[in-house]
Amino acid sequence: MLNSESLLRELRDALHEGGLTGSFLVRDLYTGEELGIDPDTELPTASLVKLPLALATLERIRLGEVDGAQQIEVAPGRITTPGPTGLSRFRHPARVAVDDLLYLSTSVSDGTASDALFEITPPAQVEQMVREWGFRDLTVRHSMRELSETPAERFESADAHLAHALAISAGTSGRGHRVPQLDVARANTGTARAFVDLLEALWAPVLTGPRPGRTSRALPPEPAARLRELMAANLLRHRLAPDFASDAATWSSKTGTLLNLRHEVGVVEHADGQVFAVAVLTESQVPADSQPGAEALMAQVARRLRDRLREW
């Protein structure tokens, strides 16, 4: 434990030097052993909200309330700022099946596809279902459309740093914020622990070894299996994947990005049978849009937490 405390101090210092704060947690899904940095700090979730959205939609498909083959006409996103993907950048309407909207929303992180799903299952209903499954620290208040109405969309790309400077400077000690999407009282929110709990419930059905004393929240197996597939197909692999994916390990995840927020949550399954849930939610104190160093630092901190758990 003393060695772990020394490691945590070292990692906190590295995050401070890199201009990052955040909520980190890594958990061994067989033993329940975990190691983290401020894992209960509440932060806006950005695109991580697409995980509970997908799970709620998949459950409604299972119950027969929603037809996965139903064709939905989706208006073009017409977004021109850097970042958004898929239908969000379309110039013309498209007809897409609900099942395919789930792929676009979860694996491609397409906000317009997510909003089409939120039209079917509104935020309040998604949150109600999340609560019924026992996840008390995941809050769903709004659709993705509101995430495209931040200061970042009001500046030219050359002035993106001004939006980040506002994001950094306009918060309060209680995590209120002048930008509503960054205000924990108004935004979709969660913690690293809440997302690790969700990941553990999603992966529990495929953990084949003994789990002494471990119980997970019960999720319907069919939606959980499909969401694992969608996370395995995640196309955005620039953040934690370089430190977790290899020929001897598979990495399934979802990213989230908004202004100075950079998040990723996922599960790494090692060829030797070990399985770890990883959640990283961060805020940057550096007013810059492109920060590859921050992405690398997030991954390094998470990997070292995982490495320490593998030694236990």
Curated annotation (Swiss-Prot):
Read off the InterPro entries from this record.
Beta-lactam/transpept-like, Beta-lactam_cat, Beta-lactam_class-A
Q: Name one GO biological process term.
A: beta-lactam antibiotic catabolic process
Domain of life, per lineage: Bacteria
Q: Does the keyword DNA-binding apply?
A: no
Keywords of this protein's UniProt record, alphabetized?
Transcription, Transcription regulation
| GO terms of molecular function | beta-lactamase activity
Q: Name one Pfam family in it.
A: Beta-lactamase2
Give yes or no: UniProt keyword Transcription regulation.
Answer: yes
Q: Which SUPFAM superfamilies would you find in this protein's record?
A: beta-lactamase/transpeptidase-like
Protein name per UniProt:
Beta-lactamase regulatory protein BlaB
